Amino acid sequence: MAAEQRVHGHQAAGDGPGLDAKVSFLSRPETYRPAPAAVACRETHMSWVFLAGDRVYKLKKPVRFPYLDFSTLARRERACRAELALNRRLAPQVYRDVVPLVQSHGRLSLGGEGTVVDWLVCMERLDERFMLDRLIANGRLTAAQVARLVDALVRFYRMAEPALIAPTVYRAELLRSLDYNRRVLLDGRFSLPSGLVWRIDHAQRRFLRQCGGLIDARFRYRRVVDGHGDLRPEHICLDDDVRIIDCLEFNARLRVVDPFDEVAFLSLECERLGAAWAGELLRRRLMRELRDGPTDMLFTFYRCYRATLRARLAVAHLYEPHPSTPEKWPRVAREYLALAARSARKLEAFLKTPSSR
C-alpha cells in the first residue's frame, strides 16, 4: 500500500504532528462526540489507549521492533485494519471501526475533512469488572463462566484456518525462542537463579529432541491453526456474552498455535492469579469438546515453554531506557520461573517413562 492515498476523499500524506501532539489531543474530552466527563489514558510499548465514555480508541506508536513495524502511516493503517478484522473473529460487536485522525488548517479532529495523519481502532468499552483477571481477583469466577468460555473457544478453534508452515520450521523457531529466553534470563543484571534457568532450558530441549514428533503430529492432523496469539485473562470478558479481545494482529507467525498451547498459557495465567482450578477445568472441557487433545506430556511442555517466555518478557522491560516500575519485573519473572520449574520437573518425569509419550 502506498504511503500516499485517497481516504474518504482526503489526501493522506505524511504523519503531520508528532506523537506527543496526537496524544495530547486524544487525551482531551472535547475531542470526542459526545464528550465524556474524562479520558483515561494508558500507554503500552506499542500503543496509546484512550478510554472515552463508552468507547476505547487505540493509537499505534510509530515504532519498529524485530517482530513488528508501525514506523509509517501506511503500516499503521494496515495494522489497524488487520486488528479490526482479526479481532472480530472473537469479539465482533466490540471492534467498531478504524477511524482517521485528520488535520485541517493546523487543527486535529477525529474524522471529518482534512489530511489523514494517523489511524485509530475504535472499540466498545467493556466492563472491567467482568474481565477474567478481575473475576479471579475478586473471587467471583464460576464454573459456569468457564464453561461458556470453553464453548466460545471451541467454536473459534473449529473455524480457525490451519497453519500453513511446515512443522520443521515451527520447531526451528521454537529452538530459536529457547535460545533467546535462556540468553535474556541468564543476563546477570537481573539476578535470576541461573541453575533453575538451565534446568528448565535443559528439560525443554530434551523434550524437543526426544518427543518433537508429538508436535509434528499436531501439524499432520491439521490441529495447529491461526489462533489468538495472546490468550490472557485480561483479554477475556465474561459478562452476558464471551468477548475475547487483543489478538496479535501484527505478526501472523506469532498466531500459529496449537489450541492447547493457547489454553496451556491461559491455564498458567489462571494459576498465577490464584485460580488453578479454572485452568484445569478449561483443559479438561476443551479436551472433551475438541476430542483431539495432545498428550499430557505435550501439554506440560507448552506450559513450561509459555511460563519461560513470560519470564523473559517480564525482565525484557528492563532493557527499555526508562522502564516503569523496574523493581516489579524481576519478581514477576521469578513467579513465572517457579511455574516453569514445576512443569520442567513433570517433563523430566514424563521423559523417564516412555509409556507416557
Task: Describe the function of each predicted region.
Residues 1-4, 200:
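A composition/secondary-structure signal for short, hydrophobic, low-basic-content segments
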Residues 3-27:
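Cysteine-rich, disulfide-bonded extracellular modules and peptides in secreted proteins
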Residues 1, 99, 347-351:
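Extended hydrophobic/Leu-rich segments
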Residues 312-356:
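ATP/Mg2+ or Mg2+-diphosphate-binding catalytic cores
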